């Protein structure tokens, strides 16, 4: 378990990761190179989360046991390199959530059709009477959804249908869903991926 977690990126994924951190009993700090949306910043502060915006303090950023990176932050970003140099484990929000859910995971990825397939599978499972959750790139962050589910009287969901983008998968270390659906692979987001491993390699 972790005592202190740094979350890089204060978007939907970052807020969700912060909520899960607090639910696990860890303290956390959210840092973003840009401005944090006022409403989100207020919610985080009310939860007792330390929020930094407009840049990153290297010493404070690396004063942690784990760095959880939002998918919008490239792996070559200086804060990520600082963490690596300090010997701090760096994982993505998707991986962080997967490590702390007791539910089974069905991950859906591919270039096109992810959201439709994820939504359809979730609908079929819920209609069939299963306690299924839906999260990831489809809307609610996986970490935030897991954090909320853990607070229910009945506990975590039995199964999660997770839409996973190539950017989210790029940050995984030992993410092993119970079921993985690879829909298709076509060239996309080349302006961002041309210096990175291909989506196929990331999926492997």
What spans do the regions from the language model cover?
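N-terminal leader/targeting and accessory segments in enzymes
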Residues: 1-92, 96
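Charged, amphipathic alpha-helical interaction segments
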Residues: 22-23, 102, 200-201
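Active-site flanking residues adjacent to catalytic metal/cofactor-binding acidic residues
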Residues: 8, 31, 136, 162, ...
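Single conserved hydrophobic/aromatic residue that forms the stacking wall/gate
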Residues: 194-197, 201-204
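Compositionally biased, low-complexity repeat tracts
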Residues: 50-51, 135, 199
């Amino acid at each position: 378990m972790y005592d202190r977690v740094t979350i890089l990126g204060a978007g939907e994924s970052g807020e969700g990761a912060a909520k899960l951190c607090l639910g696990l009993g860890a303290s956390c700090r959210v840092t973003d190179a840009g401005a944090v949306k006022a409403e989100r910043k207020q919610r985080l502060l009310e939860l007792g989360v330390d929020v930094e915006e407009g840049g990153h303090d290297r010493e404070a950023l690396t004063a942690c046991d784990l760095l959880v990176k939002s998918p919008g932050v490239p792996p070559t970003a200086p804060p990520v390199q600082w963490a690596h140099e300090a010997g701090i484990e760096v994982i993505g929000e998707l991986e962080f959530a997967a490590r702390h859910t007791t539910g089974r995971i069905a991950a859906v990825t591919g270039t096109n059709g992810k959201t439709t397939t994820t939504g359809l599978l979730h609908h079929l499972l819920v209609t069939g009477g299963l306690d299924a959750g839906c999260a990831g790139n489809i809307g609610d962050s996986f970490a935030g959804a897991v954090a909320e589910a853990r607070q229910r009287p009945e506990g975590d969901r039995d199964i999660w249908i997770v839409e996973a983008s190539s950017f989210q998968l790029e940050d995984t270390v030992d993410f092993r869903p119970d079921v993985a659906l690879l829909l298709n692979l076509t060239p996309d987001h080349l302006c961002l991926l041309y210096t990175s491993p291909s989506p196929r390699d990331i999926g492997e």
